[in-house]
A protein has these predicted regions:
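Short conserved micro-motifs at the rims of enzyme active sites and ligand-binding pockets
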Residues: 4, 64-65
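Structural signature of tandem-repeat unit edges
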Residues: 14-22, 41-64, 73-91, 102-116, ...
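A structural signal for leucine-rich repeat
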Residues: 30-36, 66-72, 123
């Protein structure tokens, strides 16, 4: 996905529909596009992605990578450690905290065959107005929608 969109456009796109296989690198790229990603040096991305449709996508894990999830503004947690979670992609559900802290994300369309939504998957998605939960979902994790409006 990174090669197709490129760094020039990734922070400008507001609506995105993806099909095919998505891996952890793609999810990390999506988080950058949505303006919610800090790397280990504290670099921040100012993306504008608000609408994400991954209904035709399959989440895959080919390399067991992990990603640390951090809030958009670390000053919110001044004096305390930033919350973080290990996120693993698999074909059964959304990993823990995979879309956490996407403060400006307004709509997400999940894969049609999704089986579960992980713990904290959408925590602090404060602008979320619409999300589909496919009939195939059998489990929704703890605090999956905590602090969502």
């Amino acid at each position: 996905m990174h090669e197709r969109i490129g760094n020039n456009k990734k922070l400008k796109i507001e609506c995105l529909r993806l099909t095919g296989m998505l891996n952890i690198d793609d999810i990390q790229f999506i988080r950058e596009m949505a303006g919610c990603y800090y790397d280990t040096k504290g670099h921040k991305y100012d993306g504008h992605l608000r609408y994400l449709d991954i209904s035709g996508a399959t989440l895959t894990n080919t390399d067991n990578k992990e990603v640390s999830i951090y809030p958009r503004d670390p000053s919110e947690y001044e004096g305390t450690p930033w919350p973080s979670a290990e996120a693993y992609i698999n074909d059964k559900g959304t990993p823990v905290a995979i879309f956490a802290y996407l403060y400006d994300m307004e709509e997400i369309v999940l894969p049609a065959k999704l089986k579960s939504i992980g713990d904290d998957a959408f925590i602090f998605c404060r602008s979320l107005k619409s999300i589909n939960i496919p009939e195939s979902v059998q489990k929704i994790g703890l605090s999956a929608f905590y602090f969502c409006i």
